[in-house]
Amino acid sequence: MKIAIVMTLLLVAFSTASFAIEPIERAALDLVMARADSGGDAGGDAGADDEGSCKWMFQSCEPPAKCCDGWTCYKGRCNLILGR
C-alpha cells in the first residue's frame, strides 16, 4: 500500500513538472527574443509610439494594435508567436 501511494505521488509530481516546463520555456524565449530582435535597444521602447512602428514585449497593446512581425497582441501585451 505504501508503494502505491509513493508511486502515485511521484506520478503527480512528474506530471506537474512536465506541464510547467512549456510555459517556463516560452517565458524565457520571449525574454531572449525580445532583446535579440530589438536592434540594439534592450528595452525595445524607442519609437514604439511613432506612427508605423511596431510594439515589443512589455508594451501594452489593444488587439488591433500592430505588434512586430512574429508577435501578437494577447492579454494586453505583445507576445511571440511560437510554432512557426
Curated annotation (Swiss-Prot):
Q: Which residues carry this modification: Leucine amide?
A: L82
What tissues harbor this protein? Answer: Expressed by the venom gland.
Residues making up the signal peptide according to the UniProt record: 1-20
Any GO molecular function: toxin activity
Disulfide connectivity for this sequence is C54-C68, C61-C73, C67-C78
Localization of this protein: Secreted
What are the entry keywords? Amidation, Disulfide bond, Ion channel impairing toxin, Knottin, Neurotoxin, Secreted, Signal, Toxin, Voltage-gated sodium channel impairing toxin
Q: Which residues form the propeptide?
A: 21-35
Output the superkingdom of the source species. Eukaryota
Family under the similarity heading: Belongs to the neurotoxin 10 (Hwtx-1) family.
Question: What does this gene product do?
Answer: Weakly nhibits voltage-gated sodium channels Nav1.7/SCN9A. High concentration of the toxin (3 uM) inhibits Nav1.7/SCN9A currents by 79%.
Q: What is this protein called?
A: Mu-Sparatoxin-Hp1
